[in-house]
Structures are given as C-alpha cells and as structure tokens.
Amino acid sequence: MSTGAYAFLYFGDTEQLLPAIEAVQDLPELHAWHAVDGHYHLALTLQDGGDAVRQNLETLSGLQQLLFCPVERELRGGFTVESEPTYAWLTMEIERDKEDAVMMALDALPTEQLRVLAAGTCGAVAVAEGPTFEAIDRLVDAQIRPLDGVLRVKRDWIIDLTQI
C-alpha cells in the first residue's frame, strides 16, 4: 500500500479524542490510526493526501493543531504495532536543500530501528522502534538529530490502547 499522507492531530480538550477516533475510523481514506503521547494525540496513515482529506480533518471538533504531511517519497511503509517493543512517530523538520542527503542517511539506518520513512511537504516522517523508550531516545539523539540538515525532531510515543 502506498501512503498518501500522514496526519498528526492535537486536541485542546482530550474529551474530544474518542469522538475524533470514531470520526476518523469512518474516513474511507484512513489506513491506520494510533493514539500517541507527545506533541500530538493522534497519528493517522492515510491513503490520500489531497486537500479534501485535510479539510475533512480540520472539521473535527476540538482540533487545535493539524500537521498534514502529503507523501512525496515513501522509502519504507507499512508496519503493525505489537505490544512489544516500543514505538514512536518522529516528525522531522529538514532543510529543503539537504533533504536528499538526510533521507539517504535515514534510509541507511536498520529497518528494525526505522519501520516507516517518508518525505513530504512537512519534512520527514518515520516510525522508530526499540526495546525501550530509552533506546529510541538514544537513536534519535545519537543518529538522527546530529544529521546535517535536521532542524527539529518531534517524538510521539505510540500508545497501545489494548494494554490499558
């Protein structure tokens, strides 16, 4: 499956999360959704990156911030969250003129560490995997943040709601 876009949603009132999850599950463009903890509350994998999808998401009740990332290049896609190990969505701001070099360096990381990797209008999107939160932190701090051209990395831990 080719990904059309990734979307990251932040709600001012977390009471709006359950209605938002129900609403996004009805979207025909939705491939997968994840509850996350960090800068956002929900991460979505979408089959379409068009303006109509973005506009539909913008109408969700209580939505305060939307990072909508249409995919221009997908180097790695598709993964399934399991109860073990730990996963985090990474959204990265990258200098446009250094994007190719950054993406090549990220693609050189083992697939076991970066399960998803895509570039788009919002920079780069990835899913990091590790045995612990600390292992993912070390990966980001030692191998991703220092890359020339990476301006900012935001980390959002994937929450397995079946474990709550």
What role is predicted for each listed range?
Residues M1-I164:
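A compositional/biophysical signature of low hydrophobicity enriched in polar/charged and small residues
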